[in-house]
Amino acid sequence: MPRLGRFAINAKNYFLTYPRCPLTKEDVLEQLLALSTPVNKKFIRVCRELHEDGEPHLHVLLQFEGKLQTKNERFFDLVSPTRSTHYHPNIQAAKSASDVKSYMDKDGDVLDHGSFQVDGRSARGGKQSANDAYAEALNSGSKLQALNILREKAPKDYILQFHNLNCNLSRIFADDVPPYVSPYSLSAFDKVPSYISSWASENVRDSCAPERPISIVIEGDSRTGKTMWARALGPHNYLCGHLDLNSKIYSNDAWYNVIDDVDPHYLKHFKEFMGAQRDWQSNVKYGKPTHIKGGIPTIFLCNPGPKSSYKEYLDEPDNTALKLWASKNAEFYTLKEPLFSSVDQGATQGCQEASNSTLSN
């Protein structure tokens, strides 16, 4: 057995406390980095803390690539750069680097060097609670912070379920999409056929809207102004390429929907959208079903062709009944020329057709 009072520590993680130490965090880090050790230093965190008496204390977490054995209790002593004063720390082997790091996070005045080495243990007893780790991640305020917390405190889930975590956290911490502002007024579209203008004036309204409005399908070549015109009518939901109806994407306060370049063969909720149906639900990926208030018309925009045209889709032999239903719930028009006379709108239209905004003004 070792003699009483003999100093010896053999550990990968060291927790040092320097009481009444006025050195800056930068001075401490510089001196610790200069220490010659047989194993590489992987991570150093220096934390400055003011106690109630106003005296500064310094805490240090040192992580090594492998175990560092030392029998020299003066090994981690620091020296003042301006005088011959030495500062001796209390030295402990950190049972849980994650707990020590979290403790130092509370004070906030920290300086880090290197990459923190994840420790799945907790000094509070065994493995940390998964619920605690996930609760902290949800309260972190950002996707990146949440992922970093789970990397440290739920490393198994981080490795095995990263694809799900990444996707779910992207949705949870999705930024609010700013309202769309049309670069053109409706008057800029000076070649809109009268029957399309009439449809818009009768069906796209905030007040006095029809109880069961009629939708419209507009088919035409690219760069004819379909999308720009449709998005200039008022506040709307813009769905392009695929449908995502979660509450951060789809608004029940919109006047109408614009469904742009969605293959009708794979259009989810075809009848609900085209028929302006009210009070229906949609299953949201990685979330609970969302309630759609509905009762608003939809503008369907498409190009000619078998995987785009709604007319060609409804002409398929298996869709006879659906075609009859659609003829009573939507108007179908084919554009022969652009909806504008200015060349500039055509260039902008090409960019717009590639975008995917949401509720827009």
Curated annotation (Swiss-Prot):
Cofactor list: Mg(2+); Mn(2+)
- State the UniProt keywords alphabetically: ATP-binding, Covalent protein-DNA linkage, DNA replication, DNA-binding, Endonuclease, Helicase, Host nucleus, Host-virus interaction, Hydrolase, Metal-binding, Multifunctional enzyme, Nuclease, Nucleotide-binding, Nucleotidyltransferase, Transferase
The subcellular localization recorded is:
Host nucleus
Query: Region Oligomerization: start and end of each range?
Result: 156-176
Q: What does this protein's record comment on cofactor binding?
A: Divalent metal cations, possibly Mg(2+) or Mn(2+).
Q: Where is this motif: RCR-3?
A: 103-106
Query: Which species expresses this protein natively?
Result: Mungbean yellow mosaic virus (strain Vigna)
For this UniProt entry, what is the primary localization, expressed as one broad class? host cell
* Residues annotated as catalytic: 103 (for dna cleavage activity)
Q: Where does a divalent metal cation bind?
A: 49, 57, 59, 107
This enzyme's EC code(s): 2.7.7.-, 3.1.21.-
Q: What's one GO BP annotation on this UniProt entry?
A: biological process involved in interaction with host
The entry's family comment says: Belongs to the geminiviridae Rep protein family.
Q: Report the InterPro entries cross-referenced here.
A: CRESS_DNA_REP, Gemini_AL1_CLV, Gemini_AL1_REP, Gemini_AL1_REP_central
Instruction: Show the domain comment.
Output: There are 3 rolling circle replication (RCR) motifs. RCR-2 is probably involved in metal coordination. RCR-3 is required for phosphodiester bond cleavage for initiation of RCR.
Name of the protein in its database record = Replication-associated protein
Region listing for Binding to RBR1, in residue ranges: 143-153
Question: Any idea where the CRESS-DNA virus Rep endonuclease domain is?
Answer: 8-116
Functional summary from the UniProt entry: Essential for the replication of viral ssDNA. The closed circular ssDNA genome is first converted to a superhelical dsDNA. Rep binds a specific region at the genome origin of replication. It introduces an endonucleolytic nick within the conserved sequence 5'-TAATATTAC-3' in the intergenic region of the genome present in all geminiviruses, thereby initiating the rolling circle replication (RCR). Following cleavage, binds covalently to the 5'-phosphate of DNA as a tyrosyl ester. The cleavage gives rise to a free 3'-OH that serves as a primer for the cellular DNA polymerase.
Any one GO molecular function term? structural molecule activity
Binding of ATP, residues: 220-227
Where would I look for the motif RCR-2 in this sequence? 57-59
Sequence motif RCR-1, residues: 15-18
Quaternary structure and partners: Homooligomer. Interacts with the replication enhancer protein (REn). Interacts with host retinoblastoma-related protein 1 (RBR1), and may thereby induce the transcription of host replicative enzymes even if the cell is not dividing anymore. Interacts with host PCNA. Interacts with host SCE1 protein. Binds to host RAD54 protein to ensure geminiviral replication.
A Pfam family that this protein carries is: Gemini_AL1_M
Q: Which GO terms describe its cellular component?
A: host cell nucleus
